[in-house]
A protein has these predicted regions:
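Short juxta-domain linker segments that transition from a proline/glycine-rich
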Residues: 1-22, 26-185
C-alpha cells in the first residue's frame, strides 16, 4: 500500500518519476521500485517523501482496501493533465475506501436499488424527460436548491462525497458493493 500511496501523491503533485527522483536525490528507477513495492524506502527517505508531499507519514502508510472503480461516469474539465487525472482517480478510490470502512461500523442499510434509477437515453429530448422523472422520484421542484437536492439524494441512499482537489472536476458517480456514490468537487 505504501507504493500505491507514494504514486498517488506523486501524481497529485503533478510530478514525473524523474522530477520526484531529482528532488529526493535518487534515481527514477528507485522511485519506480518504491511505487511497485519491490523496494522500501528507509525511515529517513520516508520522512523526506512525506515532507516533499506535505503529508504525514501515516498518510503514506495508510492501508485501506481500495475498490476497483471503472471511472466510466467521470466528468473532468478539459484542462486537467493525464497525470493529475490519474492522481485524482487514486484519491477518489481512497476516499471511497475510507467511506466503505466507516460504513462497516454503521448499523444502517445503505444498499441501493439501481434498477429504480436506470434510464435509457437516446436523444437530448430523453434527458429532459428523465430529469423531470427523477425530480418527481425525489420530490423536488425545478428550482430546487443544491443543498436540498443533496439531502433528497441522501434520503434515497445515494452516498455523496465532496473532495477537495486543487483542480476542479465536474463530478463522478460509481456503483460499488451495492452502494451508489456521487463524488463532487
Amino acid at each position: 500500500m505504501l507504493g500505491r500511496n507514494i504514486k498517488k501523491y506523486r501524481l497529485l503533485s503533478g510530478m514525473s518519476l524523474r522530477n520526484m527522483a531529482d528532488k529526493l536525490g535518487v534515481s527514477h528507477q528507485t522511485i519506480k521500485k518504491y511505487e511497485e513495492g519491490s523496494m522500501m524506502p528507509n525511515s529517513e527517505r520516508l520522512i523526506q517523501i512525506s515532507k516533499l508531499f506535505n503529508v504525514n507519514i501515516s498518510d503514506l502508510l495508510n492501508a485501506f482496501i481500495v475498490p476497483e472503480l471503472k471511472f466510466e461516469n467521470f466528468r473532468k474539465q478539459s484542462k486537467m493533465s493525464k497525470s493529475k487525472e490519474k492522481g485524482l482517480y487514486m484519491l477518489i478510490s481512497d476516499e471511497i475506501a475510507k467511506y466503505l470502512e466507516i460504513l462497516n461500523y454503521a448499523n444502517e442499510d445503505y444498499s441501493f436499488d439501481k434498477t429504480k434509477w436506470e434510464f435509457k437515453v437516446n436523444s437530448s429530448d430523453d434527458v429532459e424527460k428523465i430529469s423531470t422523472e427523477v425530480r418527481k422520484m425525489l420530490g423536488v421542484s425545478d428550482d430546487c436548491a443544491l443543498d436540498n437536492l443533496t439531502d433528497k439524494l441522501e434520503d434515497n441512499n445515494f452516498l455523496i462525497l465532496e473532495i477537495d482537489y486543487e483542480e476542479k472536476f465536474d463530478g463522478f458517480c460509481e456503483y460499488v458493493d451495492n452502494l451508489a456514490f456521487i463524488i463532487l468537487s
